[in-house]
């Protein structure tokens, strides 16, 4: 039997991973344990097992056909995990590149993954900008509030298209500054 597959997305700096991890901890205490998987890590595991990448930086240098094959295999691997327990997939709905927005879950991944719910974690663009500026542990491209808002709009559009293709519901969870517990509770209500 397939358990729930939930995809959690958000722009860098929105706090999606933090909100998801806190929700997972609370649900685990209640006896509902999700397997949390980062899609990029799942891709790297596949590439590493095949001997074609020994570190994550090599992943970007693989040819597009190899990338697609690895994405598909990672999606299949995560879907297999859902036979054992519910799965929460931490990934990006879209990736901003110099040539435009790249779908984080192209059709060949969605077919394998077949999510039940797509969650988009958001907040105001200025809050994200301030979080990014204060996070010295990461090297992120400098963006404006308007470009962050555009990225969030593209994430919503992509999430809805994922829902159209799979029948998944789409939920927007707001992670406002100082109100992370509210975002966690909202996420938990969807994951139960």
From Swiss-Prot:
Location in the cell: Cytoplasm
Keyword vocabulary terms for this entry: ATP-binding, Cytoplasm, Kinase, Nucleotide-binding, Transferase
Pfam families: AAA_17
Gene3D superfamilies assigned to the protein according to its UniProt record, in alphabetical order: P-loop containing nucleotide triphosphate hydrolases (3.40.50.300)
Binding positions (ATP): 10-18
Recorded GO MF terms: adenylate kinase activity; ATP binding
Enzyme Commission number: 2.7.4.3
Main localization of the protein described in the UniProt heading: cytoplasm
Catalytic reactions of this protein: AMP + ATP = 2 ADP
Keyword check for Cytoplasm: yes
Any one annotated GO CC term: cytoplasm
Claim: Cytoplasm is one of the keywords in the record: yes
Top EC category: transferase
Family affiliation: Belongs to the archaeal adenylate kinase family.
NCBIfam families reported for this sequence: PRK04040.1 (NF003122)
Record note on quaternary structure: Monomer.
Entry protein name: Adenylate kinase
UniProt source species: Methanococcus maripaludis (strain C5 / ATCC BAA-1333)
């Amino acid at each position: 039997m397939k358990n729930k597959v939930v995809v959690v997305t958000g722009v860098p700096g929105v706090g999606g991973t933090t909100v998801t991890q806190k929700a997972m901890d609370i649900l685990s205490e209640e006896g509902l344990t999700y397997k949390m998987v980062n899609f990029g890590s799942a891709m790297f595991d596949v590439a590493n097992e095949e001997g074609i990448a020994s570190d994550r930086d090599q992943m970007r240098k693989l040819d597009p056909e190899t990338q697609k094959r690895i994405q598909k295999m990672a999606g299949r691997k995560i879907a297999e995990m859902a036979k054992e327990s519910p799965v929460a997939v931490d990934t990006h709905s879209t990736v901003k590149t110099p040539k435009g927005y790249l779908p984080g879950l192209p059709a060949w991944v969605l077919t394998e993954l077949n999510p039940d719910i797509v969650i988009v974690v958001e907040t105001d663009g200025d809050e994200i900008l301030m979080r990014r500026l204060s996070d010295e542990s990461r090297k992120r491209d400098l963006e404006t509030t308007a470009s962050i808002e555009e990225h969030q709009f593209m994430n919503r559009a992509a999430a809805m298209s994922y829902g159209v293709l799979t029948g998944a519901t789409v939920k927007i969870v707001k992670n406002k500054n100082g109100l992370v517990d509210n975002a966690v509770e909202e996420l938990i209500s969807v994951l139960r």
